[in-house]
Every structure is written in structure tokens, then in C-alpha cells.
């Protein structure tokens, strides 16, 4: 664990020493999807990943982890998914693009580069940093994991917070009327003139 101190002091001419017990090299990553559908309550689906402390082990999510998160969301929601992702290189990987092309229930759009203010999940992370993670000195990685799960569970049960994260971006969810209109047009329309 890294020390919870942002700053420290010492006498002039002395080097400050901060003693920390239980230093750990374990790493935890979390990916989340904020799910919105007009007329229904929003949902938050997340997946933690506990990284192995071995040399050469991957220190972040792989595209297969994001694929598994999308599959989990598809199974929970029981409907096709339109993912709107930031431009993380793992989101744009060839494996993820191929997976989306092979499955008709998955459509992926990319947010513009350097636009975290358009991503509702950034609002979720902000809620965590300002709430449950603020001014806490975690004793070990398990303490951090328990705190994160509890805080994310509380956010999952507050749809107004998840809605607020979308509202903060300035984006709105509207059904695609052109798709609805195309579906209502007869198959042999327009009539062929001889």
C-alpha cells in the first residue's frame, strides 16, 4: 500500500521518513458500464479485476475482459447493447472489433478523443472519489475491495445518481426514429415502376 499522506514535513536539513506497514504490490482495476434505456431505470454493471503480482503479468484489463463485461451486461439486460466507449486502445483492439462484427447484438461507437466529460462512467468514478474513497487510509487491498464493492452497490441502488452522471455529460438518450420508421415500412416499398 502507498502511504495515505499527500505531504509531510520535517526539520530543516532532515529528510522526512514516512513509515508504512503492510506494503503490497497487489493491484485492482475496475471497469463499469452505465446502462440507459428510455423509460426504464438506469443500471450500473461493473467488474473488478485482481492482478497477479508476478513479473511480466498484465497490469490492466485485456480486450477479453471488456468482452466478458459486455457479455455479462447482455445477459443481465436481455437486449441488444450499444456501447459508447472512450478511445482506450484496448476498446479499439482488433479482437474487440472482430467480436462486435461477429455478434449482431453488439454495436460499438467511440467517443471523441480527449473528451472524458462525455463519458457518464467518469461521473461514477468521481462519485467514488468524493464519497467512499475520500480521506480513507486502506489497511490492505481487501479493505479497498470491500469499500469499493459497498460503494458501487450503493450507487447501483440509487438510479438518480446514475441518471445524474448522464445529465452531467449533456447527452440525451432518444430512440432512433429512422430505425423505427424503416421497420414499419413494407418490404416491397417503394413500389417499382415499369
Regions found by a protein language model. Give the residues of each.
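C-terminal anion-handling pockets and recognition modules
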Residues: 122-194
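Acidic, metal-coordinating catalytic cores used for nucleic-acid/nucleotide bond scission
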Residues: 83-97, 113-118
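RNase H-like polynucleotidyl transferase catalytic core
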Residues: 15-22, 104-120
Amino acid at each position: 500500500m502507498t502511504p495515505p499522506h499527500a505531504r509531510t514535513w520535517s526539520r530543516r536539513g532532515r529528510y522526512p521518513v514516512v513509515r508504512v506497514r503492510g506494503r503490497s504490490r497487489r493491484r485492482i482495476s475496475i471497469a463499469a458500464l452505465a446502462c440507459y434505456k428510455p423509460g426504464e431505470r438506469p443500471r450500473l454493471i461493473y467488474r473488478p479485476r485482481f492482478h497477479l503480482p508476478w513479473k511480466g503479468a498484465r497490469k490492466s484489463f485485456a480486450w477479453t475482459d471488456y468482452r466478458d463485461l459486455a457479455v455479462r451486461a447482455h445477459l443481465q439486460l436481455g437486449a441488444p447493447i450499444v456501447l459508447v466507449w472512450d478511445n482506450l486502445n484496448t476498446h479499439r483492439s482488433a479482437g474487440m472489433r472482430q467480436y462486435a462484427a461477429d455478434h449482431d447484438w453488439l454495436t460499438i461507437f467511440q467517443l471523441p478523443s480527449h473528451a472524458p466529460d462525455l463519458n457518464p462512467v467518469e461521473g461514477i468514478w468521481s462519485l467514488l472519489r468524493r464519497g467512499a474513497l475520500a480521506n480513507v487510509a486502506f489497511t490492505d487491498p481487501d479493505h479497498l475491495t470491500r469499500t469499493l464493492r459497498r460503494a458501487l452497490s450503493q450507487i447501483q441502488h440509487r438510479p438518480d445518481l446514475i441518471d445524474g452522471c448522464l445529465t452531467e455529460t449533456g447527452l440525451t438518450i432518444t430512440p432512433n426514429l429512422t430505425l423505427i420508421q424503416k421497420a414499419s415500412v413494407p418490404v416491397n416499398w417503394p413500389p417499382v415502376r415499369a
